[in-house]
Amino acid sequence: MAKVLVLYYSSYGHIEKMAEAVAAGARDAGAEVTIKRVPELVPEEVARKSGMKLDQPAPVATVGELPDYDAIIFGTPTRFGNMASQMRNFLDQTGGLWMSGKLVGKVGSVFASTATQHGGQETTITSFHTTLLHHGMVIVGLPYTEARQMNMDEITGGSPYGATTLAKGDGTRQPSENELAMARFQGGHVAKIAAKLAG
């Protein structure tokens, strides 16, 4: 049984909801799944005034626990076409793991959210992949066998790089069932590959 960590950052709950779907898909594929988040960097008073979701039940992860998993599925909102600074800050603390090769051969996968259809979903995921490749991780995306990413009947996220959701400029749009289904598929797909690699 593969051990999968779903590690995310979510300001307003969109990525949190996607993380839950990713985790459900991995569990359904037989994996032992843990959901954790990275620490918030925004001062609490500022976060509250901005309406950020501070009551997320997922515990905060530590860098030292990452090698305990066969696969890590990362979730982040987009910030100008890149991952959020909270996730970047967490990953920038993994130098010791890089030096010792602790993540080499682990499966890495990414899902994301943007405000708009063309707000940087794909660049966020592919730029995230650079860090995972430096760690020697095996990148897994969202293959076209998950045909929901080709749905043209509604506005939807999703690409071969990973599941995504669109939050709308004011954050009022929640992940659609189509997007959540892709997230579940990605979780299951990663879990199956991780189980094969773990032997």
UniProtKB/Swiss-Prot annotation:
Organism domain of life: Bacteria
GO cellular component: membrane
Location of the Flavodoxin-like domain: 4-190
Reaction(s) this enzyme catalyzes, per UniProt: a quinone + NADH + H(+) = a quinol + NAD(+); a quinone + NADPH + H(+) = a quinol + NADP(+)
Matching InterPro entries: Flavodoxin/NO_synth, Flavoprotein-like_sf, Flavoprotein_WrbA-like, FMN_Rdtase-like_dom, NQO
GO molecular function (one): FMN binding
Binding-site list for substrate: W98
Cofactor notes: Binds 1 FMN per monomer.
Residue numbers binding FMN: 10-15, 78-80, 113-119, 134
Binding sites annotated in the UniProt record for NAD(+): Y12
Keyword NADP: yes
Gene3D superfamilies xrefs: 3.40.50.360
Database matches in PANTHER family: FLAVODOXIN-RELATED PROTEIN WRBA-RELATED, FLAVOPROTEIN-LIKE PROTEIN YCP4-RELATED
Family per similarity comment: Belongs to the WrbA family.
Record-given protein name: NAD(P)H dehydrogenase (quinone)
Organism: Azoarcus sp. (strain BH72)
